[in-house]
């Protein structure tokens, strides 16, 4: 099991109403996205934390990498094994600049794809979630070999595992990681939940999702405040509460959004708590 380095990030910090704070965070972050995309000059918020720290957009489909993945994989919607290969490749890469240089046809030749990636100054994203080596049939594959060779070879196996998981993304993540043996299964989950953008008959967008280590501290706060039995129950309740706290949002939240933004809220309140610093990849740099 992965050691949660974020577990104590909110220790000692009082958040009087974590539900209200969650939605206030989301509203402000979405307003920042709208102002930035409309061409307004920086800063887009009076909040000093938003002026100095990097945060993901509220809705996953608005993130740059997500937009690139959607464009890359969309032609494969009706070919489920290739779609799954494309999404797993994309989440192992997780770098917009790389994905934008490729076409889904590149997936058909693993050797040429690997050569293309090697020629790039940097093909993968080091600044997001960690991507570890993968085991398959007692053989270890590096990140680049997994993304290119392994996913090409096992796309049918992955498809069978996903379909046998009966629309359950949590179970599908566990079933695949029984084979991969990764300490952190988050990249698997990300690739699987991406299927919902294209094939809700395989993974519904309304699926309950596992808790990532980054989201756990804030979901724990929400769970305690709401008096619920699980993080999945928290997601269901927060989706219901959106009508009260943020009725004008551009769409209804799904469970993945609650998990996703709980991670961002943990980051935000970690700055307040002094357990996170505005340095390195955390610092917002506006060009």
Give residue ranges: language-model regions.
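Phosphate-/polyanion-interacting regions in eukaryotic proteins
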Residues: 43-125, 159
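C-terminal accessory module of base-excision DNA glycosylases/AP lyases that mediates lesion recognition
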Residues: 1-69, 144-171, 189, 193-287
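A general structural signal for short secondary-structure junctions and capping/turn motifs
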Residues: 75-79, 179-180, 206-207
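Generic structural motif recognizing short loop/turn segments at the entrances and edges of beta-strands
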Residues: 80-85, 127, 132, 252-261
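Alpha-helical ds-nucleic-acid-binding substructure associated with the helix-hairpin-helix region
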Residues: 97-179
